[in-house]
Design a protein with these regions (language model features):
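Regulatory N- and C-terminal appendages and interdomain linkers associated
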Residues: 1-51, 63-64, 187-191
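Conserved ATP-binding subdomain of kinase catalytic cores across diverse folds
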Residues: 33-141, 165, 169-170
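Generic detector of well-ordered alpha-helical packing
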Residues: 71, 136, 177, 195-197
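AlphaC helix of the protein kinase catalytic domain
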Residues: 142-151
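Conserved alphaE helix
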Residues: 155-163
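Catalytic-loop of the protein kinase fold
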Residues: 172-179
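Catalytic activation segment of kinase domains across protein kinase-like and atypical kinase folds
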Residues: 180-197
Length: 197
């Protein structure tokens, strides 16, 4: 569901939300949707965890759900100049909405990815800033953490290969696949995250 809820100070705020959130009463949608992205309020909660990385990721809980808030930032040299603004004419100007839709599609195909909850775009005259909130995959650790603690089992290696092949079979190519966005749990189940490129 797409909802454009506010236009002020030459900026337009648009949300893409999962169906369960679209049932919020119209007069309270704007504040409710915005609360998912209120970093100051979220960080005041003692249970919130701030993660390192370019995306400024926060792990938090809301409405009895464990969630991940990620702010989209640029990388590379250009990212040092512009940081988190994407020009509206760029190919990747709508990363948050693109990732949201891709996650929904992959879930419909039974692929092991997190569920998208809500995404936001704030548009100015020529640029857009973006955020996304997804459900946290509890019990999973990224591969870089796991291999820093122990060796992988043969079964885990096999499961990683099989999981990646599922995405290839659906013609989905993760352009930044690395050990930080391959997750594994204690049962050896594998999931893939960060489809923002």
């Amino acid at each position: 569901v797409v909802a454009t809820l506010s236009k002020e100070q030459f900026k337009e705020v648009t949300y893409l939300v999962e169906s369960t959130l679209s049932g919020v009463q119209q007069n309270s949608k704007s504040n409710y949707y915005a609360s998912f992205f209120d970093r100051d309020s979220i960080q005041q909660d003692s249970k919130t965890i701030s993660c390192s990385g370019r995306g400024q990721t926060l792990l938090f809980s809301k409405d009895r759900r464990d969630l991940v808030l990620r702010h989209y930032r640029r990388g590379g040299f250009f990212g040092k100049l512009v940081k988190d603004s994407f020009f509206i004419f760029e190919k990747n100007a709508h990363r948050a909405f693109d990732e949201f839709k891709l996650l929904e599609y992959m879930l419909s195909k039974g692929l092991p990815v997190p569920k998208p909850v809500i995404a936001r775009e704030i548009k100015g005259f020529f640029s857009v800033t973006q955020d996304i909130v997804i459900e946290r995959l509890n019990g999973y650790k990224d591969l870089s953490y796991v291999i820093s603690k122990r060796e992988l089992t043969e079964t885990e290696y096999t499961n990683i290969g099989k999981t990646i092949s599922l995405f290839f079979k659906e013609n989905i190519l993760h352009t930044d696949l690395n050990i930080r966005n391959i997750l594994i749990n204690e049962e050896g189940r594998v999931a893939i995250i960060d489809f923002d490129k």
